[in-house]
């Protein structure tokens, strides 16, 4: 079996975010890392929407990311620390829309190792040097400079190693133009390591160390080091030189401290805490991330605590000496992995879990009532400041980037009966968790819907003048009339536009600079800017059947297949070409391309005829109306559309932005198929046809604009958008009801919209999230969802949600009541009334936990609920709250053979589980009966067990439960579940159970798969085979009777198969006279499974399912990852295909090596050598290679570049999207 890996949705969790002017313009962009992906985002300063400019897979782990700019430069470069053992400097090239690798310097081994640098990066604020550090021992400094041609140069590395030293954080200190200096949080463990008593370990202190790079001596010195009182977790650089006092802020537990090199005294201030917080008061508070904003006259920091509260930190200075630190509560947003403050006044928050946000900073919070805390305020030792959290006041949310990270569980099923299955994804963490329903399609936002007096049959938009940015009129055609609407603040009917209103319209357009043309069945109406009208009437009894118009040309087809061609002359007159052309059959559809910039006319006309052909006809004056080429079609054409697509934007000498693309002829057929063929711009030949089935109705095509490029809207029983995005063609359905006719629409509120008609309504739509594969509906949950099952009869979901370090609702209410009583008791006689009021206000206050976070209860505290949910409406039908410290780990829905048709839900619960050091007071299996057609859970009984029941699976009318490392069969009893049989020989802990026939496949938490056979007659569970590798299995899926696919904690996927001669009729030989080796207790079972495939995904996979994703498609193995990625593994059906893709992969490995210097083959073989899998993500980078490299690779394969692209597209569309 050979598989091909494809990513459907890239990871959405963000681990790092940096900002800078990467494209060299004044506009700031954000570069984010999503594990093994680099992405460039640009927030639009006018609309506040975040657009993705570029996404690149780096096939390596991005461990650190920094932006830097050379002194006096205008462009920021990106330094990447990864697991490749190399430092890589990238530059964004806006003209090619790609990251270019400027430097790649090797310094160590590959992999994420303790002493190989790459974990921490620090840049001198003036861009003169960069320090790259490991977790332990090694630090390297590179000097950055320019050569004579102003290109970036990099020196050989200077070492600043110190053995037995752990590093916690590194930053560059802003010292102006003096020797660059770096500050590190370090800890020396040499004494602790050599001291057997453990005293030294308890006394080890963290130190703040300054390293100075002497530019004169080209050498790094350890300048100064001092021990710290508290344990710091990160450093913030304070602006220096002429901008500020220099130095660093150390964020540590409960305190923030300012330190500077020299005799400056330390200034420290406690981190304020929430008033009346339900958290454990003994728990320390730390800052987790920060952002700096610096202008010429001032600077401030925004730092976020682990509860999500942001504080604005300012420093008071007296002659460059810091005298106090001031903190002021700013706002609360979800806890971030990184924050960026942009010059345009935006705050980008890359959340640790869940969606990412872009906020507008509306106020700086200087003049509000919020109390300001200062290091100068007197406090008792151990006391702190208190503040009251509140909803957003200084920030305004302007955009939200959907993120599925972390996906904890996913099932694919068509519960909504839509033909195409939906993905039901349990994601998020704690109170920000959600169940999301993903459907393949683009999200459509409706900006306006208005009813029309009848059912129109067509709609167009036109501008008044060629220079206009926005459209002026919407023209709606009915069976016997035409309605003209003007576009302004509102849309109103106009009567003096010059259009003929008493007839239906076939087409209309802006002609020349400022004239309009209307084509109707009896003629052509040319309306000049001064409202003069010229008319051309059809001869005799003939009428116009079809037409095609653009800015300078009009072509009409009369009854009987006669073509008449008009072209505009320089004076603005429409002139008929002397000859007319008779076609051999009736004309069904026609299309003209837009006139290319700087040219007089479009050279080609495409005509579709009744005889199932499409013909290209020349409009060049030298051979006007002569046929150039023809293509036979499998069915009758319905509509045609010529567009220029796939171009990269370029600026010509005059600064005009044009794009160099290819001409494509899109052909919509009456049987619901869309064809896309390449139209040769010189000869007019048609080649390289791609086909896709869109739906059951004839396909109508419309040209629209998306992100400054032409795109095609195709309408069948569903509407689809064909567009080019990041050097790949996308054909994506719109998640919207059926439309009938459409046109591009541009107005101030909606610069790239679509106006469409559906029955008797006119709709204005916008598509914002281009490039998105799925649109999603999210239903909020209370705790982290762990697993869910689908009730087969009602299609309801039964979800178990469990959080560690959390309180149940009952405990929270109890704690609040207790605190309120304490408040009243603590008050004196005269303050009793006031205290009672405060206590009442405290009890009534309810800040949403999804923003303000849930109180942390401490380790060993668990909260769980069992939820029954309708997945289509998203409403909760039943909610069972478990008691404090009961944690639900497994769930199953099953029928028992002795109870008939009733459905039961079994939930495995652990009691008082402590994770480290591990201990558990036992567990229970709760049994519920599903009543009311699967909408309510009726509690039957709970069965005590001795360990955590981490896996439950229905089995032959009974149920299999993995209790710790015991595998048991239970049956339903009156008072509890009855144990029927057990097996004690599983190694560590059962994490999952799959069943097929008499076989049970058990996944062990660290010993891969174990095959067990249930013998009914002897009532025994007997192990008959296992795997040879230790795998830390997270999830598994059965592929057939002998084959299982599994994923492990380290990001690998494997497929394991039992050899054909495996015998599962083994005996546990009770007589004991068999050979010892057949008992196989020492090294597992006597029969071993074979590994069919191994593949390193690079992200922990938490769900696997064999399913089909598109109606009529083939089966594939779908996986979802912890970082929010969704991918599929598809089997090759022919040896030729496998051979072809193997060669594509081989050539791309050498021609297009990964961006961060990691070797592709060794990345995919991180833990196990990659076996029988071809990396489709690498193969698809063929599309973004430079044309000459594409040509080289395809010549090696004896193909042309379009043929290779077609193969890549075909394998994708056969299985997915």
Curated annotation (Swiss-Prot):
Chain residue ranges for the region called Interaction with SF3B5: 1100-1123
InterPro entries: Beta-prop_RSE1/DDB1/CPSF1_1st, Cleavage/polyA-sp_fac_asu_C, RSE1/DDB1/CFT1/CPSF1, WD40/YVTN_repeat-like_dom_sf, WD40_repeat_dom_sf
GO biological process: mRNA splicing, via spliceosome
Gene3D superfamilies according to UniProt: 1.10.150.910, YVTN repeat-like/Quinoprotein amine dehydrogenase
Positions of the UniProt region annotated as Interaction with PHF5A, SF3B1 and SF3B5: 105-119, 145-168
Residue numbers carrying Phosphothreonine: 1200
Alphabetical UniProt keywords: mRNA processing, mRNA splicing, Nucleus, Phosphoprotein, Spliceosome
GO cellular component, one term: U2-type spliceosomal complex
Location of Phosphoserine modifications: 156
Segments of this protein annotated with the region Interaction with SF3B1: 1028-1049
GO molecular function: nucleic acid binding
Entry's localization field: Nucleus
Keyword Ribonucleoprotein (UniProt): no
Site features described as Interaction with SF3B5, chain residue numbers: 284, 306, 352, 429, 916
Location of region: Interaction with SF3B1 and SF3B5: 193-231, 786-804
Entry's transmembrane regions: none
Predominant cellular place of this UniProt entry's protein: nucleus
Entry-linked Pfam families: Beta-prop_RSE1_1st (PF10433), Beta-prop_RSE1_2nd (PF23726), CPSF_A (PF03178)
Key word Phosphoprotein present: yes
Record remark on domains: The core of the protein consists of three beta-propeller domains.
Function per UniProt: Component of the 17S U2 SnRNP complex of the spliceosome, a large ribonucleoprotein complex that removes introns from transcribed pre-mRNAs. The 17S U2 SnRNP complex (1) directly participates in early spliceosome assembly and (2) mediates recognition of the intron branch site during pre-mRNA splicing by promoting the selection of the pre-mRNA branch-site adenosine, the nucleophile for the first step of splicing.
Subunit structure: Component of the 17S U2 SnRNP complex, a ribonucleoprotein complex that contains small nuclear RNA (snRNA) U2 and a number of specific proteins. Part of the SF3B subcomplex of the 17S U2 SnRNP complex. SF3B associates with the splicing subcomplex SF3A and a 12S RNA unit to form the U2 small nuclear ribonucleoproteins complex (U2 snRNP). Within the SF3B subcomplex, interacts directly with SF3B1 (via HEAT domain), SF3B5 and PHF5A. Identified in the spliceosome A complex; remains associated with the spliceosome throughout the splicing process. Component of the spliceosome B complex.
Name of the featured protein: Splicing factor 3B subunit 3
Organism, as annotated: Pongo abelii (Sumatran orangutan)
